[in-house]
Structure formats: structure tokens, C-alpha cells
UniProtKB/Swiss-Prot annotation:
Belongs to the amidase family. GatA subfamily. The active site is at residues 78, 153, 177. GO terms for cellular component: glutamyl-tRNA(Gln) amidotransferase complex. It comes from Borreliella afzelii (strain PKo) (Borrelia afzelii). Transmembrane segments: none annotated. The keyword Repeat does not apply. It is an enzyme of class 6 (ligase). It comes from the Bacteria. The keyword Isomerase does not apply. This is Glutamyl-tRNA(Gln) amidotransferase subunit A. Its EC number is 6.3.5.7.
Length: 481
């Protein structure tokens, strides 16, 4: 048996029936990492995870599973989620050397229930990017074809799962940063409803949209980890309870479900391979008795403009704290305070991060706030969110391709940020309206590159979305472990 080709639930089954040790399974994943380090999915593999695995093996020798429902579950973590006594750099030179003094709420909940954190993963610096090429630690490669990007910003978390260097990983999703790399690497990528998981301990990019998300090979794994990490948290006033009676996930017919397709996201806008895959996806669903209707949402044309107005404004505020005085790397030069700030941030932040900070400050400057930022917030709250709420009164889910484009060749788009931003057009919808969404691996092109399909659910109905997705995978025979 290949011990590095398992779901979390299968790992726990083997461990609890004494057929395998946690240590041996973890070692198999570590060996895969050692053999394929060039993928650059991990910034750091935690050596102490092997000691923790040994300790849990000893514990299981004498005890039964009760208070540790996640024992033996191995999870990699994106480098913008705080783990006590571990480095936290957000893949930026400006935070080099910073050690987190506390656990994020999601991390604390995982640890308290027996999960083992096995490493921190690469990302676009401060989660700003769609390719995972904007990292201080270098680009992460796509395990399916190393000449192509993995997608971002959570590319490292996607890569370690796709390359069987971890069975499960945490990422963060602000505008598609979990779903896009999941689509590009042929695995599942799930973004919960806004507030479904506490953001306490997640380094902030755009606080109105940021959400911790999951990568996996199994819907059941996603549902299990969501069950044990979701819920309100006193450390995050935006967190909410989302657990519902759709868990445990049930096997049900797809017959009679109502799906919506957005007219303005037409196939003429897509790469031809994506368009043909999406057409086949719709045909497959129709053949299972699902109803699909095309709806017009003219406001969809504002989606990217709104996202790339609000998110850099919030980023410029959130990243103002990285001055060199409190966190991470610090210069020793004798400068005035303003000169110190200027030189420190100029030297240790990447061009993409500086681009978004400058844009955010410009949009907040006198005379432009009401013209751009306030107007974007007004359109989002008064037009877009109500329009989608109305749509969900007559449909169960919305389907789109995860991305209009296939994975593109690495290194091609550094000088064309607008083209990179365009890859988010389908995924930002769920972030703007606070809804759960998932990317399912659906097809591959002749180069072996993956094309994913996205399903968006109702806000705070995350388990309903996962249940439906499980049945789509089952009835369409989509590949998985």
C-alpha cells in the first residue's frame, strides 16, 4: 500500500485499526517531499512533527479515540496562518525571522483535536498574486507540468497535496486563492462562507474578503475538518456558526436540483479548452436530471473593478504595520523615522505588494475616496449582494469554470498584472457575496493540465454545498483518491 496516497479518513481508519502507525504514514509523505523538493511547495517541513507522530502512536497503544477525533490527521499550513513557536513570514523578506507567539484559532482547534501540523507552505507574498511566483522563497511549480504555474496565492498548499507531500492543507482565499490553484493542480479547493472559520491568526490582506480554506483529495476530508474548525470565536467578531444538518454528508440523487449559469460569463470569453469543458460539465449535469437556467446579472461586469478597488485599499491599511519596528527583519542604519520606513518597505517588499499598497493609498487620497472606494462599497452592498441573494431564492447553486484560462507558462505574466487579475473573474464572486464555493477537478487538456469547475452555494450553507459536491463527484465519476 502506498502510504502517501491516502485521504485523512483512510489514514485514521488504518491508524485506529492498528494496521499502520502515524509515524510511518508521515514518513512516507516526508520522503515524497525529499524526492521532489524542486516543486517548492514547502517553505519548511516540521521535523518535530515526526516526534509528535511517535507520541500519538504511543498514546493509541494504550487508549481509545475519544477526545481526539482528528488524531493522525496530517495537515500542511500556508505561511500566513499563525502557528505558535513557528516562523510566520507570509513569504516576504520583511517578516524574515519572525516567530509567531500564538496559534490561530483554526490551528488551536486542530491541535486540540489531535491533528498534526507537518509544515508551512509557500505562497504569493502577503497573498497577493494568482501564480505563486511572487514569493521571497521562489516560485512554486505545478506538479502536473513544471513549466506551468500552479496558481495562487495558496500555490504551495495546493502543490503539496497534488504532489502527495501532504494529504490535506490549509490555504487562504481572498479572491480565489484556494480555488484557482486547486483547479490548476487537479485537486479539491474549498472556500467556506465568510466568517465560517475564525480569521484570528490569519495575516490580513483584505479583511472584508479573507477566509481560510482547504485543499484535499476527498470531500469527506473537507467536511470533517470543517466540522471541527468552524464556528464563532470570541477573538473574531466577524465569525459565525455555520454547522448544519447536512453533516454527515449523504448520498442523494441530483435529480431536480436547480443550478444557475451567469449569461455575462459566456463561453466566448473563455479559453477554448475551458469553454468545451464547461459545456460538457453542463451536459453531464443535465443528463442527471439537474435543471440549469441561464440568468443575466449585468452587474457582473463590475465584479473585478470592485474587488481590485476594495482589496488594495484594505491591504494598504493592513500592511501599514510592517514598518521594521515591531516585526521581522530590521535595518541597522541610522535614519530619520520617515526615511527608515521608506527604505525598509522599499527594500523588503516585492513589486506586486508595493503596487497594491500604492494603489490602495491612491484610492483613499483626498478627492478620490468618494469617487472610487466609497462607490465600490455602495455598488457591492446595494446592487451586487442583493442581486445574488435574489438569485439564490430560485436556484440552489451557481456553476462557473473556476478560471476562464488554463494554467499558463511560468514567468510569462510578470509585466502584465491586469491579465493576472483577470484570472480571478469567476472566483471573486463568492468572496464579494460571502458565499461558500468549491473547485472540483473536472478534466485535463492534451498537455495534462487540469481544468476545474466551480460550484457556489448559499451563504452559511457550507455543508449543503459539500453534500451536493460529493454527489456530483459520485454521479459524474470524477477522479479522486
Amino acid at each position: 500500500m502506498d502510504l502517501s496516497n491516502l485521504t485523512l479518513t483512510k489514514i485514521q481508519e488504518l491508524v485506529l485499526t492498528k494496521k499502520c502507525k502515524i509515524y510511518d504514514i508521515l514518513l512516507a509523505y516526508k520522503n515524497n517531499y525529499e524526492l521532489n523538493k524542486d516543486i517548492n511547495g514547502y517553505i519548511e517541513f516540521f521535523d518535530d512533527s515526526l516526534e509528535i507522530a511517535k507520541r500519538y502512536d504511543d498514546f493509541l497503544r494504550n487508549c481509545e479515540l475519544e477526545d481526539l477525533p482528528l488524531i493522525g490527521m496530517l495537515i500542511a499550513v500556508k505561511d500566513n496562518i499563525s502557528i505558535q513557536d513557528k516562523s510566520l513570514t507570509c513569504a516576504s523578506e520583511i517578516l524574515k525571522g519572525y516567530i509567531s507567539p500564538y496559534d490561530a484559532t483554526v490551528i488551536k482547534r486542530l491541535k486540540n483535536k489531535g491533528a498534526i501540523l507537518i509544515g508551512r507552505t509557500n505562497m504569493d507574498e502577503f497573498a497577493m498574486g494568482s501564480t505563486c511566483e511572487f514569493s521571497y522563497y521562489g516560485a512554486t511549480l505545478n506538479p502536473l507540468n513544471r513549466e506551468y504555474v500552479i496558481g495562487g496565492s495558496s500555490g504551495g498548499s495546493a502543490a503539496v497535496v497534488a504532489a502527495f507531500q501532504a494529504p490535506f492543507s490549509l490555504g487562504s482565499d481572498t479572491g480565489g486563492s484556494v480555488r484557482l490553484p486547486a483547479s490548476f493542480s487537479g485537486i479539491l479547493g474549498f472556500k467556506p462562507s465568510y466568517g465560517g472559520l475564525s480569521r484570528y491568526g490569519l495575516a490580513s490582506y483584505a479583511s472584508s474578503f479573507d477566509q481560510i480554506g482547504f485543499f484535499a483529495h476527498s470531500i469527506e476530508d473537507i467536511a470533517l475538518i470543517l466540522k471541527h474548525t468552524c464556528g464563532a470565536d470570541k477573538m473574531d467578531s466577524t465569525s459565525v456558526d455555520i454547522f448544519d444538518d447536512f453533516y454527515p454528508l449523504k448520498i442523494e440523487s441530483l435529480q431536480g436540483k436547480n443550478l444557475a449559469v451567469i449569461k455575462e460569463l459566456g463561453e466566448d470569453l473563455m479559453d477554448k479548452n475551458v469553454a468545451s469543458s464547461f459545456a460538457k460539465f453542463k451536459f453531464d449535469l443535465l443528463s442527471k436530471g439537474i435543471n440549469i437556467k441561464e440568468v443575466s446579472i449585468e452587474e457582473i461586469n463590475f465584479i473585478l473593478s470592485i474587488y481590485y478597488t476594495i482589496s488594495p485599499v484594505e491591504a494598504s491599511s493592513n500592511l501599514a504595520r510592517y514598518t521594521g519596528l515591531c516585526y521581522g527583519k530590521r535595518m541597522s542604519e541610522n535614519l530619520s523615522l520617515n526615511d527608515f520606513y521608506f527604505k525598509h518597505r522599499s527594500n523588503f517588499l516585492s513589486e506586486e505588494v508595493k503596487r497594491r499598497i500604492v494603489l490602495g493609498n491612491y484610492l483613499l487620497s483626498e478627492g478620490y475616496d468618494s469617487k472610487y472606494y466609497s462607490k465600490a462599497c455602495e455598488i457591492l452592498q446595494n446592487l451586487i449582494i442583493p442581486k445574488f441573494n435574489k438569485l439564490f431564492e430560485s436556484c440552489d447553486f451557481i456553476i462557473t469554470p473556476t478560471s476562464f484560462v488554463k494554467p499558463f507558462r511560468a514567468g510569462l505574466d510578470f509585466d502584465d498584472p491586469v491579465k493576472m487579475y483577470y484570472s480571478d473573474i469567476c472566483t471573486v464572486i463568492a468572496n464579494l457575496i460571502g458565499a461558500p464555493a468549491i473547485s472540483l477537478p473536472y478534466s485535463k487538456d492534451k498537455e495534462g493540465l487540469s481544468i476545474g469547475m466551480q460550484i457556489i452555494g448559499r451563504s452559511k450553507k457550507d455543508f449543503e454545498l459539500l453534500s451536493f459536491s460529493k454527489n456530483v463527484i459520485r454521479e459524474l465519476g470524477l477522479n479522486g483518491i
